[in-house]
A protein has these predicted regions:
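A conserved hydrophobic helix/loop-capping motif in glycosyltransferases and polysaccharide synthases
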Residues: 6-18
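Short, well-formed alpha-helical segments that are part of the catalytic scaffolds
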Residues: 16-32
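Glycine-rich, basic loop-to-helix element that forms the pyrophosphate-binding segment
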Residues: 45-59
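Short aromatic/hydrophobic "clamp" motif used to bind/position activated sugar donors
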Residues: 64
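Short acidic donor-binding/metal-coordinating loop in glycosyltransferase active sites
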Residues: 67-71, 154
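Conserved donor NDP-sugar-binding/catalytic core segment of glycosyltransferases
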Residues: 72, 77-115
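A recurrent flexible, glycine/aromatic-enriched loop bordering the glycosyltransferase active site
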Residues: 126-152
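C-terminal catalytic/acceptor-binding lobe
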Residues: 161-227
Length: 227
């Protein structure tokens, strides 16, 4: 049975320095009274989806936060804010940036009506505030959210059978939640941002197009692109 008073922070790790900094931020988050936290690094994962599945199965936490090793969670009240959103049991997943309607390509950032906010620190001493539209209320439902941070209150298997690498696993998971009738939402961050993302420039994997084909083959009939 899931432990309603526990949150697990799950990260696939191949850079110990980045993960050490990320966990430093996680350990400084405020936890509501009675809540506990666990930190689950996954090393040597065959893919993001496979790593997340392994950690998901190993934890009894009701609330699981899947985040990249280069994501710094700076909102000290993140857990409180997350629990407030999850009071709505129709909300299955929370991200920080995403789009209301996926385009025909399945690539969320090419979609229309993108919502959310994240600070990007791609170079030393250079921070860009990537602020998109903000929800009018506390949060807004989206069709897809970015995998830099995805938090869940229900366990649904990540599709490691379709995505053997590091792309499309996140958009796929959003649609897996939708298939089961759950909302994926992005919170209002107008007053303050939740995350700093520190990605390093790297080329797309050669298999990217193949994973995209897998995505469209599996979920193409769910897409209704806006024009």
């Amino acid at each position: 049975m899931a432990d309603d008073m526990k949150v697990a922070f799950i990260t696939c790790v191949n850079d110990e320095g980045q993960y050490e900094e990320s966990v430093l931020y996680l350990r400084h988050l405020h936890l509501p009274k009675g809540m506990t936290a666990e930190y689950l690094p996954v090393r040597g994962a065959a893919s993001m989806a496979a790593g997340y599945n392994a950690a998901m199965k190993s934890s009894d936490a009701r609330y699981k936060v899947y985040l990249h090793q280069d994501t710094l969670l700076v909102n000290k009240d993140f857990v409180r804010d997350l629990l407030q959103i999850f009071e709505d049991k129709s909300v299955g997943m929370v991200g920080v940036v995403g789009c209301r309607s996926l385009p025909a390509s399945g690539i969320w950032w090419d979609g229309m009506r993108c919502y959310g906010r994240v600070l990007h620190a791609c170079e030393p001493e250079s921070v860009v505030d990537s602020e998109m539209m903000e929800p009018e209320g506390a949060y807004i439902d989206v069709e897809a959210a970015d995998g830099l941070l995805l938090a869940t209150q229900y366990d649904i298997r990540w599709r490691d059978d379709l995505f053997g690498g590091w792309h499309f696993y996140d958009t796929s998971q959003c649609l897996e939640f939708a298939r089961r009738g759950y909302q994926v939402v992005v919170p209002n961050q107008e007053k303050d941002f939740w995350c700093i993302h520190c990605p390093r420039e790297k080329p797309l994997a050669p298999e990217y197009k193949e994973w995209q084909k897998n995505f469209l083959r599996e979920y193409g009939d769910m897409l209704s692109p806006e024009v």
